[in-house]
Amino acid sequence: MRNIGDGKKTIIRSAAKRDDANEISSEKDENTTNKLTKREFGAKTFAFTSLSLFASSSSSQKEEAFADDSLNSNFWEKVDLPLEPGVILLDIAFTDENARHGFLLGTRQTILETFDGGKTWDAKDLGQDVIDDEVNYRFNSVSFNGDEGWIVGKPAILLHTVDAGKTWERVGLSPRLPGIPVLITATGDNGVAEMVTDQGAIYLTTDAARNWKAAVEETVDATLNRTVSSGVQGASYYTGSFSTVSRNPETGEYIGLSSRGNFYMSWAPGQAYWQPHNRSSARRIQSMGWRKDGGVWQLTRGGGIYLSDTKALPEEDDEFTEGKIGSRGYGLLDLGSNASGTKYFTVGGSGSVFSSEDKGKTWKRDRGTDEVAGNLYKVAFAKDDVGFILGNDGILLRYRGSA
C-alpha cells in the first residue's frame, strides 16, 4: 500500500485492505472504525479514510414506494418508501436537468432510486463487490454533475459513478483521514469534486479521485487551539466536530457549525485555515447554511430564525435580522428554498413545516403536516416544482405546489 510520503497537497490512491467496521446504532452516536477498499489516498496533514456506497440491506426492500394523499397540506404529499422503521433519510440528488432520475440516501445502508421525479422509489442494490452487507453504513451525501456522481458516508466510504448510477465503484481512502466525510459536491465535469469531513478537512480532485489536493492545512480543532485568543466564545481548546457543513454553490465558500452550536466557522477558496465566528444570538445555533441570494441563515434552539442582512457571509456577528415565526418552541432543523429562491421552507420537530414568500421575513405554518409523526431534517429542491423534505423513520414529503 502506498501513501504520499511528504506532500500535504496531494493524495495518491493505492490498494488497501479492509478493516472491520462496527455497526452504527443510532443517528447521532455511531461508534465505528474506518474501512478500506480498492483505492487509497493520503496527505501529510489530512488523509481520506475509505468510503463505500450504500447498498440495499435486505431483499425485503424490493417493494415499490409511491406518493399518497394522506396529508391535508397545500404544498406536500407523503411518499411511502420500501424501508424498515427507524431509517433516517439524509440526502437526495438527481442526475438529469428534468429531475426525473435520482437517488435518496439514509442510515442503515439505505439507497433508493427513482425514475419518475420521486413519486415512486425502489431499493438500489450495489452488490457485495462494492459494499459489505455486514457493515451498517450511514450515507451522508450524494451529488451529481450530469452522469457523474459521488456518495460519501460513515464508516468512511466514497462511491463514484460515471453512468448516472447504473454502476458504482468504491474509492479507497486512507485510515489517516481526519473525521468522517459528511459532504461531497460534484463541482465540474470529468472527475472534478470536493469532499469535506466533520473535522474540517477539505479535499479537491480533478481526475475522478486518482489524486486529491488538501485545501486547508489543518483541522478545525488544531486551528482553534492554536488561536486561543480569537475571541470566539467556546472556541478555545475545542475538541468537537462540525454538526453541519454547507457549501455556497456560487462562490465555493463553506460554513461549518460547531457540534455544540456555540460558534461557527467559514472557509473561502484560497484560505489556508477555517475562520471562527461568534453566533448572532444568545441561543445556540441548531443549523445554518446559505441562501439562494448568497446570504446566510441561522436556526437557533427553541425555534428562532435569523437571516444575514447582506447577500454574503456577514463580517460582523450582529449583521443578522430575526424572522417572524411562531414555532411554538419546536426546534427548527433546516431551511431551504425552491430553485429560484422565491419560496422558503423551514422544517423541524414533530412534523413542523413553515413557508415564507417574502424571503424569510414572515412565515406561515403548514398545519397539514402536523399529523406527520416524526422529525424533519432536510429541505431539498432540484427545480421550482420538484422538492422534498427528508425526515426520520423513513419520512419523505414530496412538493406538489400550492393547492
PLM segments and residue spans:
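N-terminal secretory signal peptides
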Residues: 1-36
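Residue-level hotspots at or immediately adjacent to binding/recognition sites across diverse folds
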Residues: 36-50, 61-403
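Short hydrophobic alpha-helical membrane-entry/anchor segments
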Residues: 54-58
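Intrinsic disorder/low-complexity segments
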Residues: 11, 22-23, 49, 53, ...
